[in-house]
Amino acid sequence: MATLLSAQRAGWRDYLELTKPKVVVLMLITSLVGMFLATRAGVPWSVLLFGNLGIALCAGGAAAVNHVLDRRIDALMARTHKRPLAEGRVAPLPALLFALALALLGMALLLMFTNALTAWLTLASLLGYAVLYTGFLKRATPQNIVIGGLAGAAPPLLGWVAVSGHVSAEPLLLVLIIFAWTPPHFWALAIHRKEEYAKADIPMLPVTHGERYTKLHILLYTLILLAVTLLPYAIHMSGPLYLVCALALGLRFLQWAWVLYRGSRPHAAIGTFKYSIGYLFALFIALLVDHYLLLNL
């Protein structure tokens, strides 16, 4: 009866929240960039529209599964305690059915309007995030973000393959950029929310190894990220405009990581986290602008 009443109280905004729309939007930006970088011609409108819609639906389905599996953890954390399942506005079964419907519709669109490889890579990414990361790694190891980050790094590869139909070095390099970006991004948030993660018994790196150790690894990963972001220029995938942007954005990220490591600002952790979001958006936009600038030279 409680489950039924919960489902009756749920509105469309609750189900939209299950999909983590802000996260999906950032994923779609990287997917779009992957599509446009894959071709010197225009991207077919059907691939552009339905390919990204399919990727978004699958990502939303994975996010909904994350809400279901993390509902007890979410209820213990200030950042997440008002999520639909944590507050009981949506019951687990309707949320799972919603996730399944999104995933099936997304897969159908990808199979119809892109290609089978894109669909299966998207499915692998969905399962990697929803099952491997959320269901196991998140609760099992402080390296959860490092290992599980591969699933979240897939969108530019999915966009590229949706257009080209095959995997090549360039989209894998885009995946590598997001893969290297993920640890400093999430560990900065984990430092800011350390007590909440400890209360929820989630073995995030600041909880298991302390803040100083985590800050050092944020700094090291930011250095790795800076080096990785220079590779598109090194392999002639991008030009001088991207190089300048990558250096400027990366050095600013490194400055944030250094300030965090030195402990000279009280809110450096959340500042680093927020900067990392804008950083990734700006970096991929720079890749896109540089791509079309090179085509017109």
UniProtKB/Swiss-Prot annotation:
Membrane topology value: Multi-pass membrane protein
Membrane-spanning residues: 23-43, 45-65, 93-113, 117-137, 145-165, 171-191, 216-236, 241-261, 277-297
GO cellular component, one term: plasma membrane
Its EC number(s): 2.5.1.141
Subcellular location: Cell inner membrane
Gene Ontology MF terms in the entry: protoheme IX farnesyltransferase activity
Primary location group: membrane
Enzyme class: transferase
Superkingdom of origin organism: Bacteria
One Gene Ontology biological process: heme O biosynthetic process
Cited Pfam families: UbiA
Note: Carbon 2 of the heme B porphyrin ring is defined according to the Fischer nomenclature.
UniProt record similarity statement: Belongs to the UbiA prenyltransferase family. Protoheme IX farnesyltransferase subfamily.
Protein name as annotated: Protoheme IX farnesyltransferase 1
Encoding gene, per UniProt annotation: cyoE1
